[in-house]
């Protein structure tokens, strides 16, 4: 089944294998069984709609469960140069951008890799930590230091919106 699919030029990920079938081919470490984040760099005129090449890419990978980010790298490079947030916001408004494509790229990457972020806050610093989605607090604490998981006592948790509100 996999061989035929590959010979047709298709990625294994689009085959929709069962867990049993996936474990049977796991030792092969097939790259086409991995999710892919495609990034299409388009010209400024196509930054909101894409172009024929990005449309063809989207069409080609639509059944794979992968994602395509369409962006204009020249504009993104200019956005990255701004130090003043107001200037950055004005520039983005001029191009009718809600957020930089780099932010979408980061969010899509986290989603694709099944990652999440949690924050720790102390007197001197606030820090972001990357963890796998679904981890419990003790596992998340192990990212800071392995001993933290072993001696874990409690976590004070607050939703982001509540944190901003209160």
What are these regions (language model features)?
Residues 1-166:
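C-terminal-of-GTPase-core extension/linker across diverse P-loop GTPases
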């Amino acid at each position: 089944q996999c061989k035929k699919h590959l010979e047709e030029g298709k990625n294994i990920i689009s085959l929709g294998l069962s867990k049993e079938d996936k474990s049977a081919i796991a030792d092969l470490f097939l790259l086409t069984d991995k999710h892919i984040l495609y990034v299409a760099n388009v010209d400024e005129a196509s930054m909101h709609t894409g172009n024929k090449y990005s449309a063809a890419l989207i069409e080609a990978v639509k059944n794979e469960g992968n994602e395509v980010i369409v962006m204009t790298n020249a504009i993104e490079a200019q956005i990255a140069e701004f130090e003043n947030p107001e200037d950055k916001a004005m520039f983005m408004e001029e191009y009718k951008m809600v957020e930089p494509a780099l932010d979408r790229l980061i969010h899509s990457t986290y989603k694709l890799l099944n990652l999440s972020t949690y924050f720790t806050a102390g007197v001197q610093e606030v820090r972001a930590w990357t963890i796998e989605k679904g981890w419990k607090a003790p596992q998340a604490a192990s990212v800071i230091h392995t001993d933290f998981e072993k001696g874990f006592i409690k976590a004070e948790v607050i939703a982001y919106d509540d944190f901003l509100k209160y």
